[in-house]
Regions:
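Conserved small/polar residues in nucleotide/adenosyl-binding loops
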Residues: 1-5
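Conserved SAM-binding loop of SAM-dependent methyltransferases across substrates and taxa
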Residues: 7-20
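Conserved SAM-binding motif I beta-strand of class I
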Residues: 22-27
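Conserved SAM-binding loop
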Residues: 36-37
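A short acidic, Gly/Pro-enriched loop at the edge of an enzyme's catalytic core
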Residues: 58-69, 77
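Mobile active-site "lid"/loop adjacent to the S-adenosyl-L-methionine
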Residues: 73-102
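Conserved Class I SAM-dependent methyltransferase catalytic core
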Residues: 96-153, 157-158
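SAM/dcSAM-binding transferase cores
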Residues: 152-192
């Protein structure tokens, strides 16, 4: 399952690489949903479907449903930055703190007991997300993402599994680009 804004590209990759799986992409933004549907038709993947779904509204049909969840919640808190006047951009980049809590809570509820969720977000939101996750029996592994070696983390990757109690782990940072702006060995290995 791909719960995110602009769900099409990641859902396509997961469906292509896992042809025997069922892949569902949730998308709230109607324009992004239409683009995802066009890409789906173009690539003719039978194991993929998209659903218009606000990720902040719980759908009981999907409780304990997914083995794998990939999610990219909006990165910016709506009340802390200047927002775009384009409504398509607003739904994909900005979120309230209360809606982000709902989004993350739904990920936990949708995840099977032995499932895994991966969430990417801004590094500066890490403490906010961890504080929310501490209310659940989860193992949360945090991996800072650096654009280049020796740069400050811009984003973070959270790996979430259900547990008997809350466990927090931190892994070494993943460096995205090498000195020539190519993908680093970290990224090449991670995508394998």
């Amino acid at each position: 399952m791909c719960i995110r804004d602009r769900c099409g590209s990641i859902s396509l990759i997961v469906a292509y690489r896992n042809p025997d799986s069922e892949v569902i992409g949730f998308e709230k933004n109607k324009i992004h949903h239409q683009v995802a549907i066009l890409n789906h038709k173009e690539n003719n993947l039978e194991n993929l479907k998209f659903k218009i779904q606000d990720n902040c509204i719980f759908d009981p049909h999907y409780e304990n449903y997914f083995d794998l969840i990939l999610s990219n919640p909006p990165f910016y808190f709506a009340n802390k930055v200047i927002q775009s006047k384009d409504p398509s951009i607003n739904t994909s980049k900005y979120i309230s703190e209360s809606d982000l809590k709902k989004w993350l809570n739904n990920i936990i509820l949708y995840l099977k007991t032995d499932g895994t969720a991966f969430i990417i977000n801004r590094y500066e939101n890490t403490d906010f997300m961890l504080d929310m996750f501490k209310n659940f029996n989860l193992e949360v592994t945090t991996t800072p993402l650096l654009s280049f070696k020796d740069s400050k983390p811009k984003n973070v990757l959270l790996k979430i599994t259900k547990s008997n109690y809350f466990i927090e782990k931190t892994l070494n940072a993943i460096i995205i680009h090498d000195d020539l702006s190519n993908y680093s060995k970290d990224i090449e290995n991670w995508f394998k």
